Amino acid sequence: MLNLKKLLSKTLEEIADLKAAPSGIDAVVQQGTSGNSNYRVWNNGTVEVWGVVNANCNEMSSFATGLYRIAKELSFAILGTLGVTTITSEQFSVRTTGGSGYATVWSAYIDASNKAHIQVVGSNANAGTVAIDYYIVGTKS
């Protein structure tokens, strides 16, 4: 049985590697990397793209939304290059290391309007590394 706490601490990239192939899929016909992204194309036309985009910044809460948009555009560009015509699922998450180890992250999430939020407290709380993890599945026609 999977340890839920252990699973929740993994990045989306690691989770993508743990996922079993959907039923009816039995072979990867193409796989590789493009920039920060990894991708797999399955024999039934299913395409997976996952990875992480991160950056150091002085204003984590305001910078996170821009970084999320970059992650989304990069991953969708790869899907387009691979011939994907339909997005069947997309997962994005935001995380941070906090400000030089002196900040506490209260919450980090992406809301329904595609705005990333990071709430931190502590000295130098606004400075640190922001990371956007993503896992997207689409289909080729």
Predicted regions, residues:
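Extracellular attachment/recognition segments
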Residues: 46-141
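Glycine-rich, low-complexity segments
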Residues: 1-54
